[in-house]
C-alpha cells in the first residue's frame, strides 16, 4: 500500500473512531432522566408546597439532572389515603401525609392525635427526630412504605362559622370535620362536638355549603386553603401537634442504586429543614393575614385548657391500648425529657 493511501486510511479510521466516541457521548447525554412522581394534598403556594418544589430542585442538583421530580399539588392525585395506596401499589413514588391516615395502617401513629402532647415545636422536633420517632418510621417498610423523615404540619387550631369558641362548652354540638382516624374522632366526640371524618380534599366545599360547621388545621393551611372565606371564627387552641410523614414507595426505593438512594435521603434531609422553617414562618404570617381579613380570633385560657385535659384524660387512657401503651408512654416520656420537665 502506498504511503499516501495508508495515511488516508489511518485518517479515515481515526475520524470514524472519533465519530463513534462523539455518538456515545451524545447518547449518554440524551438518556432520559428518571421521573419521580410526587403528589400531595396542599396548595402549591403553601409553605409545604414550596418545600416540595425545593425537594425537586435538590434532587435535580444532587443527581446532575439524572433524576427529575414532578410535583402534583392541590390534591391532583387524590386525598391522603389514595396517595398512600398509590405508594403501596407502586403507582406513585413520593408523598407526604399527616399521621392520621397512616394510623389506619399502623395504629401507633395515632399517638400524634392525642391532645396537648407537645408544648412547642422544639419539643416536637426532639421527639420526632429521636429514637421514638424512628421506632415509628421503622414500622413502615412492612406496609410497603419508606419513612424518609418527618416534616411539620404543626399545631392545629379550630375554625367555625357558628360562633366564637373560647370555652370547652362552646365546642358542644359543633359539626366539626376531623381527620379520618379513631383517635381524632374519639377526642372530639368526648369534647361534645359532632365529629365528622372527611378527606381534606372535600373540606372547603363542605365548609362552604355548611355540611360541616368547622374544622381544625394549622394556621398556614387555614390561610392557603382559603378557609377564612367561609370560616369567620378562629380559636388558637394548639390542641394537637401533627407531623407530616415524608414517604417513599418501598418497591420503587428498593430498585434504586445506592447513589440514587443517597440523593433521595439527602434531599429529604435538606428539605426537612427548609420545610420546618417555612412552615413556622408561614404560621406567623398566616395569623397576621387572617386578622387582616376580619377573622375573629379567640384563645383558650389556661383554666379552660386544664378543663379540656381533664375531660379527655379518660379518653386518652382508653386509647392507649388501641394505639399501643408502649408507644404512648415512650413518646410522653421523650416529650417530658425534651421539655426539661
Language-model regions, residue ranges each:
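Bacterial N-terminal signal peptides that target proteins for export
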Residues: 2-13
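A general, composition-driven signal for non-globular sequence regions
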Residues: 1-2, 31
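Sec/Tat signal peptide C-region and signal peptidase I cleavage site
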Residues: 21-28
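Bacterial N-terminal signal peptides
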Residues: 12-21
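N-terminal secretory/targeting leader peptides
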Residues: 14, 28-123, 131-133, 140-341
Amino acid at each position: 500500500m502506498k504511503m499516501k493511501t495508508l495515511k488516508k486510511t489511518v485518517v479515515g479510521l481515526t475520524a470514524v473512531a472519533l465519530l463513534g466516541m462523539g455518538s456515545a457521548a451524545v447518547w449518554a447525554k440524551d438518556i432520559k432522566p428518571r421521573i419521580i412522581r410526587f403528589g400531595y394534598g396542599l396548595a402549591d403556594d403553601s409553605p409545604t408546597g414550596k418545600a416540595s418544589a425545593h425537594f425537586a430542585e435538590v434532587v435535580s442538583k444532587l443527581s446532575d439532572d439524572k433524576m427529575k421530580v414532578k410535583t402534583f399539588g392541590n390534591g391532583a392525585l387524590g386525598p391522603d389515603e389514595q396517595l398512600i395506596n398509590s405508594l403501596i401499589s407502586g403507582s406513585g413514588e413520593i408523598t407526604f401525609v399527616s399521621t392520621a391516615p397512616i394510623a389506619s395502617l399502623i395504629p401507633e401513629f395515632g399517638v400524634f392525635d392525642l391532645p396537648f402532647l407537645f408544648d412547642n415545636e422544639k419539643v416536637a422536633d426532639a421527639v420526632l427526630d429521636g429514637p421514638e420517632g424512628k421506632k415509628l418510621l421503622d414500622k413502615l417498610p412492612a406496609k410497603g412504605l419508606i419513612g424518609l423523615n418527618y416534616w411539620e404540619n404543626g399545631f392545629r387550631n379550630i375554625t367555625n362559622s357558628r360562633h366564637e369558641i373560647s370555652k370547652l362548652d362552646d365546642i358542644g354540638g359543633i359539626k366539626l370535620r376531623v381527620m379520618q382516624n379513631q383517635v381524632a374522632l374519639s377526642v372530639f366526640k368526648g369534647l361534645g362536638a359532632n365529629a365528622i371524618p372527611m378527606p381534606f380534599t372535600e373540606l372547603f366545599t363542605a365548609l362552604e355549603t355548611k355540611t360541616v360547621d368547622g374544622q381544625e388545621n394549622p394556621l398556614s393551611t387555614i390561610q392557603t386553603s382559603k378557609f377564612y372565606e367561609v370560616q369567620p371564627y378562629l380559636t388558637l387552641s394548639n390542641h394537637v401537634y401533627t407531623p407530616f410523614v415524608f414517604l417513599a414507595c418501598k418497591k420503587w426505593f428498593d430498585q434504586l442504586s445506592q447513589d440514587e438512594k443517597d440523593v433521595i435521603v439527602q434531599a429529604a434531609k435538606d428539605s426537612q429543614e427548609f420545610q420546618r422553617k417555612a412552615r413556622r414562618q408561614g404560621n406567623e404570617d398566616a395569623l397576621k393575614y387572617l386578622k387582616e381579613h376580619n377573622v375573629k380570633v379567640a384563645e383558650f385560657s389556661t383554666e379552660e385548657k386544664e378543663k379540656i385535659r381533664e375531660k379527655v384524660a379518660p379518653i386518652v387512657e382508653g386509647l392507649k391500648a388501641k394505639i399501643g401503651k408502649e408507644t404512648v408512654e415512650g413518646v410522653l416520656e421523650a416529650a417530658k425529657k425534651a421539655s426539661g420537665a
